[in-house]
Amino acid sequence: IVSPPVCGNELLENGEECDCGSPANCRNPCCDAASCRLHSWVECESGECCDQCRFVTAGTECRATRSECDLAGQCTGQSADCPIDRFHRNGQPCLQNYGYCYNGKCPIMHHQCYYLFGANATVAQDACFEENKNGIGDFYCRKQSDRLIPCAPEDVKCGRLFCEILPNTRCKHAPGDNGMVDPGTKCEDKKVCFNRKCVDVNTVY
C-alpha cells in the first residue's frame, strides 16, 4: 500500500513540485507551502544563474577564468545553469608570446619544469634536447608497440622534457609519460608540439 503524498512533510512526493514544510516553517521562497507547487512566477529554484527563484541577468559572470586561455562563464538570462566552459581558440598567443593556447590552457616548458621539479627549475638549454634523437632509454619522441621512435632533428623539443635546476643541475628529466613535453607546447616560434612533432601553429589548428 502506497501512502498518498502529504504536503508539508518536507518530503518531495509524487505530484508535488516542492515541499518546504508548513507555511510557518517554509524557507523556500519559490515554493507555495500550502499547495506544494511552485509559485507561478518562478523561473528556477537553484543553480549558478538562479537568484531568488529567477534567472539572473544575461552577462552575469558565473564562472571565473582559470587561465589566460579560458573564457569566463556568463549567464544567458534563460537558464539557471552556467553554460559549458568555453576557451580562446587553440593557437592564440598567451603568456606574453611564450606559449599558445591549447584547450583552455597555456602550456609552456618552464611551467612543466616547475611542476616536475619545483620553484628552482627552468627549461634546460637546447643542447640537452638533442638526446631525444637517440631513441633509447627515456629519450625518444614516440612509441610503437615496444619500439622507441627517435625524434627527428626538428622535433627534439616535443619528446622528453629537459629542465635545469638552479644552481648546478643541467639536463634533468623525469621518466614516464609525465616527463614528456605536453601537447600544444610551443617548440619554436610559431610552432607547437602536436603528435610529438613540432608543427606550424596555423596549420595544426
Swiss-Prot record:
GO CC term (a single one): extracellular region
Tissues expressed in: Expressed by the venom gland.
Signal peptide: none
Pfam family, one: Disintegrin
First-listed, main subcellular location of the protein, grouped into a coarse class: secreted
Glycosylation sites recorded in the entry for this protein: 120
Occurrences of domain Disintegrin (ranges): 4-90
Listed InterPro entries: ADAM_Cys-rich (IPR006586), Disintegrin_CS (IPR018358), Disintegrin_dom (IPR001762), Disintegrin_dom_sf (IPR036436)
Protein location: Secreted
Motif (D/ECD-tripeptide): 68-70
Superkingdom: Eukaryota
Annotated keywords: Cell adhesion impairing toxin, Disulfide bond, Glycoprotein, Hemostasis impairing toxin, Platelet aggregation inhibiting toxin, Secreted, Toxin
Keyword Secreted included in the entry's annotation: yes
Function of the molecule: Inhibits platelet aggregation induced by thrombin and arachidonic acid with IC(50) of 40 and 50 nM respectively (in rabbit platetelet-rich plasma). It also inhibits the adhesion of melanoma tumor cells on fibrinogen and fibronectin, by interfering with the function of alpha-V/beta-3 (ITGAV/ITGB3) and, to a lesser extent, with alpha-V/beta-6 (ITGAV/ITGB6) and alpha-5/beta-1 (ITGA5/ITGB1) integrins.
PANTHER family named among the record's database cross-references: ADAM A DISINTEGRIN AND METALLOPROTEASE DOMAIN, ADAM METALLOPROTEASE
Entry similarity comment: Belongs to the venom metalloproteinase (M12B) family. P-III subfamily. P-IIIb sub-subfamily.
Note in the entry: Negative results: does not interact with the alpha-2/beta-1 (ITGA2/ITGB1) integrin. Does not inhibit platelet aggregation induced by collagen or ADP. The disintegrin domain belongs to the long disintegrin subfamily.
Name assigned to this protein: Disintegrin-like leberagin-C
